[in-house]
Amino acid sequence: MASEMEKADALLHTFSTASAFSSLGLGLFCFVADRVQQATFIQQHDWLRALSDSTTHCVIGMWSWAIVIGLRKRSDFCEVALAGFFASIIDLDHFFLAGSVSLKAATNLQRRPPLHCSTLIPVVALALKFLMQLLRLKDSWCFLPWMLFISWTSHHVRDGIRHGLWICPFGNTAPLPYWLYVVITASLPSVCSLIMCLTGTRQLMTTKHGIHIDV
């Protein structure tokens, strides 16, 4: 577990000016990106609309993880890119459920595809954590469950403004208010980063990779 000094340091960094501006920028990006996607020339083309939507998911995932780790060395960009991949790859389950590469079929499903079940996020993150412990990878890859959790959660919350959250086995919530989506997305990296500090994940990342959490 993290020491009391590390916990205090986490609190100071979480509420730092840099964190506030980074989170504000993320929230502003969400707003601007959604407005851009409402442009007529995007809405008139299915593939362009799908591409812009996936790109927004990707950028939000990348931005969120960048807030968590900071961008101090070349390997950090690889982690940020991986977070963006996790955030956008979820939508491939549309094609899996449709059993077709047709975009029309993938976007006109009778039910939501499996990776859009929000209950899976903590389940998969915890399963990944236990698997890493079993394979003795918990130190070198301790960031991975958190990266997946943040990337997938940001995707689900953004989808939630249209469809609500699918909480198995209870069903779907009402669509999320837009302001709540922006607030959750902007604050999620800092909240998770703080929890990482309090649980000792930050310390492992620092000692193994020289990563300094910048929240």
Swiss-Prot record:
The chain crosses the membrane at residues 77-97, 114-134, 178-198. Its main location: membrane. InterPro entries: TMEM267. Keywords: Membrane, Transmembrane, Transmembrane helix. It is found in: Membrane. It comes from the Eukaryota. GO terms for cellular component: membrane. It is a multi-pass membrane protein. This is Transmembrane protein 267. It comes from Xenopus laevis (African clawed frog).
